[in-house]
Design a protein with these regions (language model features):
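STAS-typified acidic loop motif
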Residues: 2-31, 50-51
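Amphipathic alpha-helical interaction surfaces in cytosolic regulatory modules
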Residues: 23-78
C-alpha cells in the first residue's frame, strides 16, 4: 500500500511517497496530490519517490499527469 506525506513551504509543496505504487494506489495518490495542489497553489511541486519500493507504469503516468496539472496552474514540478 502506498502512502503520501505532504510538507508545505513558502510557495512550495513536497510530497513524499512510500510503499508500492500500482494502478490502484496511483489513483488514490493522484487524488491526494491534486487536492493539495489545488488548495495550496504552490509555485513548485516536488515529488520524492525515495520511499517507494515498487512502481509500475501507472507511477510514470502519475508523474506526467502531476507535471501537466501543476504546469496548467503556472507552477513547475521537480
Amino acid at each position: 500500500m502506498a502512502k503520501v506525506c505532504f510538507v508545505p513551504g513558502s510557495g512550495t509543496l513536497a510530497a513524499y511517497l512510500s510503499g508500492e505504487i500500482d494502478h490502484h494506489a496511483a489513483q488514490s495518490i493522484r487524488r491526494e496530490i491534486d487536492a493539495q495542489v489545488d488548495d495550496r497553489l504552490p509555485e513548485l511541486l516536488t515529488l520524492d519517490f525515495s520511499g517507494v519500493t515498487f512502481m509500475d507504469s501507472s507511477g510514470v503516468g502519475l508523474i506526467l499527469g502531476r507535471g501537466r496539472h501543476i504546469s496548467a496552474l503556472g507552477g513547475r514540478l521537480t
